[in-house]
Amino acid sequence: MFIMIKKSELAKAIIVTGALVFSIPTLAEVTLSETTVSSIKSEATVSSTKKALPATPSDCIADSKITAVALSDTRDNGPFSIRTKRISRQSAKGFGGGTIHYPTNASGCGLLGAIAVVPGYVSYENSIKWWGPRLASWGFVVITINTNSIYDDPDSRAAQLNAALDNMIADDTVGSMIDPKRLGAIGWSMGGGGALKLATERSTVRAIMPLAPYHDKSYGEVKTPTLVIACEDDRIAETKKYANAFYKNAIGPKMKVEVNNGSHFCPSYRFNEILLSKPGIAWMQRYINNDTRFDKFLCANENYSKSPRISAYDYKDCP
């Protein structure tokens, strides 16, 4: 166990920097539309009475599509077309509503992996929403969510990630597309702490990505494959106390990428989407789908350790 700052201190630090949060378009949305959007039937939806079996990776995405340039393309130009379905706050069960992003032409993939993404303390869905279309365009069903309260702690965010995954599995549009045994979770700040906690509680979560994570527990027994995104100059959830400690104590497959000169908000800045998209997609493909073709985008031969944008890099199980 290592020394932690008190939650009240974290709250104070974030509130002080609140102007920065709301000055960047993708970090937060002050108001949340409560309009319920009608269900859109997916062209790739498999019969709910008889689900398809998972396909082999090569059946899903051709080798020629898997390139470093494609993985870093932030225009959502993965191998699949995507649609979205809005989940209103009123209809959501156990979380604050959100958006489901899903591929429409992935019938060759069989059942798909599903990923839930949660924002951090005093933040909204918009701060992490870019992960939705990026991952969906690579063959995942993804839900980006708002929390019940922007002040919810990490344990509450873990419960809401869990509820969001259940919501997708039961959804009448995308539920029959999902393999409930191939799940993932992504969270920023306290949401990252929530992803760590969820990984210790739900065995069907095969991969997580804590972004500048904070939790007042060490979580040293995380066996789930974990990609930690750290921010070098994080003064809210200091990297040495949190991200580095979580990474050091994890005992499963693990990788860390630290953004050079990054503040606590580095995972939400638009100009870091290209930097983080490639390892993020590759990690989820490798460990949710067991697609070893993505190994080459996780290792040092992709020059993570030499990039001026990255101040620290480590991959425990680099082949």
Swiss-Prot record:
<dbReference type="GO" id="GO:0046872">
    <property type="term" value="F:metal ion binding"/>
</dbReference>
<keyword id="KW-0443">Lipid metabolism</keyword>
<dbReference type="Pfam" id="PF12740">
    <property type="entry name" value="PETase"/>
</dbReference>
<keyword id="KW-0378">Hydrolase</keyword>
<dbReference type="GO" id="GO:0016042">
    <property type="term" value="P:lipid catabolic process"/>
</dbReference>
<dbReference type="InterPro" id="IPR041127">
    <property type="entry name" value="PET_hydrolase/cutinase-like"/>
</dbReference>
<keyword id="KW-0442">Lipid degradation</keyword>
<feature type="binding site">
    <location>
        <position position="314"/>
    </location>
    <ligand>
        <name>Ca(2+)</name>
    </ligand>
</feature>
<feature type="binding site">
    <location>
        <position position="317"/>
    </location>
    <ligand>
        <name>Ca(2+)</name>
    </ligand>
</feature>
<dbReference type="InterPro" id="IPR029058">
    <property type="entry name" value="AB_hydrolase_fold"/>
</dbReference>
<protein>
    <recommendedName>
        <fullName>Lipase 1</fullName>
        <ecNumber>3.1.1.3</ecNumber>
    </recommendedName>
</protein>
<keyword id="KW-0106">Calcium</keyword>
<feature type="active site" description="Nucleophile">
    <location>
        <position position="189"/>
    </location>
</feature>
<dbReference type="GO" id="GO:0004806">
    <property type="term" value="F:triacylglycerol lipase activity"/>
</dbReference>
<dbReference type="InterPro" id="IPR050261">
    <property type="entry name" value="FrsA_esterase"/>
</dbReference>
<keyword id="KW-0479">Metal-binding</keyword>
